Amino acid sequence: MDTLIRIKRCALANRLRLTNKARDELEIDDLDITDIRESLMNAVAIYKTIRSTNPQSHRREYLHIIQSHNFSGITIYTKGKLLVEEGIDTFYLLVSSKRAL
């Protein structure tokens, strides 16, 4: 299944989680989780996928960067990863969420 569709399904089902960094960025930019959900639902493509190594587990992971606008027209930058448990997309963890420059 397409990764963007999997991310959109997590957003639609309100299965989004934020790191402290992402939460702080939202607060600084005066955004909330609804803005992020709207932005993810409006996305037409994943801008970039980055291969990374988790510092805690030392396992490879993929971070997806998406830039899209919310329903108010604000362009939002998000970076996150799909977390899968037992073959099921559990939720989308947002590592970074802020207004795009």
Task: Label every model-predicted segment.
Residues M1-L101:
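Ribonuclease/tRNase effector modules and their secretory precursors
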